[in-house]
Amino acid sequence: MSRRVILTLVLVTILVKTMAGMESKKVETTDEIKKRSGTSEKERESGRLLGVVKRLIVCFRSPFPGRRAISEQT
């Protein structure tokens, strides 16, 4: 693999881990605390990572949410 691809993968991994860490520090509601009490730490961490990855995919698919894609405009 080229160095550029490896560097890109490393940077995306760091970004995902950072965003997951930031999400874990948000204030929890009582419903989230009740839901969390039945799950293990590993399950919660994987859920956070999946949530971050889903948001990144949405961001890359539509970087400007107010604008439609060029293919939709024609």
Swiss-Prot record:
Residues modified to Proline amide: P65
Propeptide: 22-33, 69-74
Tissue: Expressed by the venom gland.
Entry similarity comment: Belongs to the non-disulfide-bridged peptide (NDBP) superfamily. Medium-length antimicrobial peptide (group 3) family.
Listed name of the protein: Antimicrobial peptide HsAp1
Gene Ontology annotations for the cellular component aspect, listed alphabetically: extracellular region; membrane; other organism cell membrane
Alphabetical UniProt keywords: Amidation, Antibiotic, Antimicrobial, Cleavage on pair of basic residues, Cytolysis, Fungicide, Membrane, Secreted, Signal, Target cell membrane, Target membrane
GO biological process: defense response to bacterium; defense response to fungus; killing of cells of another organism
Keyword Membrane found: yes
Signal peptide: 1-21
Domain of life: Eukaryota
Keyword Membrane: yes
